[in-house]
Amino acid sequence: TFWHDAAAQSAGCAALRSRDGRAAAARARCWRSLRAPRHDDFIYAARTHAVVQQYGLDLPRLLRAAWDTNVYYYENWQGLYVSGFTLAFQPAIFGNKYYGATLVCVLLPLFFCLYGLARCVVLRLDPAQGRLPWALALLLTFALIEGMPAPVEGLYWFNGAMNYLPYFSLAVLNAGLAFALCFADKLPTRRKFFYAAAGCVCSLVIGGGHQVAGLLNVLVLLLAAALCAVRRRNFWQVPALAAAMAGLLLNVLAPGTQVRTAGFAGAGFAEAVVKSFILAAMEWIRWLDVPLLCLLALLVLPLLHLTRSAVLSDRVFRHPWLGAAVTFVLMWAMIFLPSYTMGGIGAGRLLNVVWMTFVLGLAATEFLLLGWLERVRGVSLHGAEQFCRRQARRLPLLAAAMLLCMACIGSHTVKEGQDSYFATSLEAAYELANGSARRYADALDAREALLNDAAQPDVSIRPLNDDERPWLLFYTDVAPGPDMWGLTPYFGKQSVTISDFE
């Protein structure tokens, strides 16, 4: 069968790599059209950019500048004791041609953390499936990218992406480590200590990355620790949970966090609870669309195979609805935190990580549901498997059609009034073909040349017109206000103004 046929598994992984590669290529070509930083990229990287301009690649000075940036924002704006350091290394400080590394900085952690999760789960349930973790990681990465509600903030903008996704990715990896430690009695002593230590490190990094990812990490570890402590007398998740709580508190109680939250009109507790509950429910309805159903269909056979593992007892599958309930609570909590502190969920990049939590939670729910059907209700699904086996020649075509559907439709975006648009690789290819990505790049290059002109200490830039604002790549243009004026110190100007601003 497929599950014990290495050649068939290799062919399946190759097909997924081919489809993912073509989609990523369209994204990358579209991304190469945008070669300039934007918005908060300038603010966080002003010190490191100045070091590169004056001293070149002087690593000690760069590290010191990044650390100074980190400390400044920890004390004056946000309690992100890791993220400020990371954001200071915005790739364009070495030259705008390197800004495209953003896509790599986002995709690599996401893919390998998904692989880590899949490996921890799959090899515990069926050690013979060495290639299945790779296939699952490729499929999930593809699905998460194509369905991302705000791709410009999650893939194309360094500050927007790197302030959220790497820490969410680490939370995903931490969930895999927590699952592996649920079976600590079957692990060698060294591996148990390694997993526990890795969980602590990941938790501390997540806590210094973003508060919403930190809260997600705490809740997942709390659930795992509670289940293992009650049912197995297993406390190996407790160190990572303690580190996660310490990291989140260090973030929330930072002086900079107090400064930031004071600038927002936060909602009352009860109001935030109700509003976040309603928004979480609305997102469930909004995101249950055809591409997501395609993903769940593609996951049926591998998940069904894993539910038959003798490692898990039947009682694990008694209440499959708990998977959906836990997913909803996690989404609710992730939306509640910014709603309570800032009065709303804010930018679409935050919805990106809520969307990813939703997708992974539904995959876990599907796993529990399949196990419940076979192992609790006694419904045999072998007949359906045999039918699929008889249709083995047609299944690759069906899978390709589903992947194509995910690549062409994706998920709804969060841009107001533009629900008819879908943020997929198809849209990226379209913007390349009609020249809108090129016009956007040319306009930014012209603006960059003006800002880099040492003969002009005072610069006036014009807003982008409608033809220079491609739907997929464009987020917002520069505007008066403190959030936008990292331009002045970044380029060493006396002043930067906007002409004809409306």
Locate each region found by the language model.
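Transmembrane-helix motifs of polytopic, lipid-linked glycan transferases
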Residues: 101-130, 134-135, 173
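Signature aromatic-anchored transmembrane alpha helix within multi-pass, membrane-resident enzymes
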Residues: 194-196, 245, 318-324, 372-418
